[in-house]
Amino acid sequence: MVAYWRQAGLSYIRFSQICAKAVRDALKTEFKANAEKTSGTSIKTVKIKKE
């Protein structure tokens, strides 16, 4: 059995992005602001100091 998202030619990452957007769009107005804050991507890089 092949997953539906695979049959549609999507990767799992793209499928999960589409699902997350659909859930955020379906939220009530009072919860949308918090969901939009957490939907962004953030990366932190740390340089290792050699001693």
From Swiss-Prot:
Residues with the N6-acetyllysine modification: 21, 32, 37, 44
Coiled coil (residue ranges): none
SUPFAM superfamilies xrefs: Epsilon subunit of mitochondrial F1F0-ATP synthase (SSF48690)
Keyword Transcription attached: no
Positions of post-translational N6-succinyllysine modification: 21, 32, 37
Subcellular location: Mitochondrion; Mitochondrion inner membrane
Keyword annotations of the record: Acetylation, ATP synthesis, CF(1), Hydrogen ion transport, Ion transport, Membrane, Mitochondrion, Mitochondrion inner membrane, Transport
Origin: domain of life: Eukaryota
Any GO MF annotation of the entry: proton-transporting ATP synthase activity, rotational mechanism
Example of a GO cellular component annotation carried by this entry: mitochondrial inner membrane
Biological process, per Gene Ontology: proton motive force-driven mitochondrial ATP synthesis
Secreted among keywords: no
InterPro entries the UniProt entry points to: ATP_synth_F1_esu_mt, ATP_synth_F1_esu_sf_mt
Subunit details: Component of the ATP synthase complex composed at least of ATP5F1A/subunit alpha, ATP5F1B/subunit beta, ATP5MC1/subunit c (homooctomer), MT-ATP6/subunit a, MT-ATP8/subunit 8, ATP5ME/subunit e, ATP5MF/subunit f, ATP5MG/subunit g, ATP5MK/subunit k, ATP5MJ/subunit j, ATP5F1C/subunit gamma, ATP5F1D/subunit delta, ATP5F1E/subunit epsilon, ATP5PF/subunit F6, ATP5PB/subunit b, ATP5PD/subunit d, ATP5PO/subunit OSCP.
Protein family membership: Belongs to the eukaryotic ATPase epsilon family.
Functional summary from the UniProt entry: Subunit epsilon, of the mitochondrial membrane ATP synthase complex (F(1)F(0) ATP synthase or Complex V) that produces ATP from ADP in the presence of a proton gradient across the membrane which is generated by electron transport complexes of the respiratory chain. ATP synthase complex consist of a soluble F(1) head domain - the catalytic core - and a membrane F(1) domain - the membrane proton channel. These two domains are linked by a central stalk rotating inside the F(1) region and a stationary peripheral stalk.
Protein name according to UniProt: ATP synthase F(1) complex subunit epsilon, mitochondrial
Gene source species: Rattus norvegicus
Organism taxonomic ancestry: Eukaryota, Metazoa, Chordata, Craniata, Vertebrata
